Amino acid sequence: MAVTAAMVKELREKTGAGMLDCKKALVETDGDMQAAIDFLREKGIAKAAAKGDRIAAEGLTAVAVEGNKAVLVEINSETDFVAKNEKFQTLVNNVAKAVLASGATTAEAALAAEYEAGKTLETYIQEEASTIGEKISLRRVAVLEKAEDAVFGTYLHMGGRIGSVVVIDGTSDETVAKDVAMHVAAASPLYATRDEVSAEEIDREKKVLTEQALNEGKPANIVEKMIAGRMNKYFEEICLVDQTFVKDSDFKVGKYVESKGGKINSFVRFEVGEGMEKREENFAEEVMNQLKK
């Protein structure tokens, strides 16, 4: 498979490795992006790719809650200027409420739902976009539900650049729930518990860590013990219950919630633009600057 400049760019953004290292990794792995990431990590050149990679899009997230259901939405605009516009902020909140009322669980279903008599949510967004003067789109929707004896925690960071919702069972303590939602926004966990991590992902991580240890010259007979310790650290980075609580470093998040009589059920976190392509305009200039060195 031919390795393109766009592929090198994507790998560099995901790993922070140099362009030549990225190109070599892609050549060695026949253009397989995940395999190339693992290749760079095994060589000690790159860290694990963060969830969402680089962020390019503008917009806001918003939360709507009613009873035992909560909705988190992400709406994109073309510029940060519009994202700070009061009309856009009103639109985002209206969309979140409309999605909650519609019962939709996907962006596609939400857009097709009725917003008001004779008008779909998609039409409402298009009309407001014409007034605001930019393309505006509902990118994604997440719906969480809770039991009667559970509580929602919600948090919007930087006016909505990051939005999070958590469900905590066994308590009605909204302060605890909000604190955990703030932690989710700050620490960006990928999973609630270790049970949610797939066997495939665990096996891949063990392989990478094993190769790292062997490349460091560690004796094979102690590599297995090292891997066990490093896997625990890996879970502490990606699993909410195992992360060190940002508001009290004496606690892991799961233990903190348990100390308050609750148990973490689930969460969702949106960061505006995560996973979307970075704009292309500066890549050629960046390459030229590297070649001049």
Swiss-Prot record:
One of its GO terms (molecular function) is translation elongation factor activity. Keywords: Cytoplasm, Elongation factor, Protein biosynthesis. Gene3D superfamilies: 1.10.286.20, DNA helicase RuvA subunit, C-terminal domain, Elongation factor Ts, dimerisation domain. It comes from the Bacteria. Residues 79-82 are annotated as: Involved in Mg(2+) ion dislocation from EF-Tu. It is found in: Cytoplasm. PANTHER family: ELONGATION FACTOR TS, ELONGATION FACTOR TS, MITOCHONDRIAL. Belongs to the EF-Ts family. This is Elongation factor Ts. The gene is tsf.
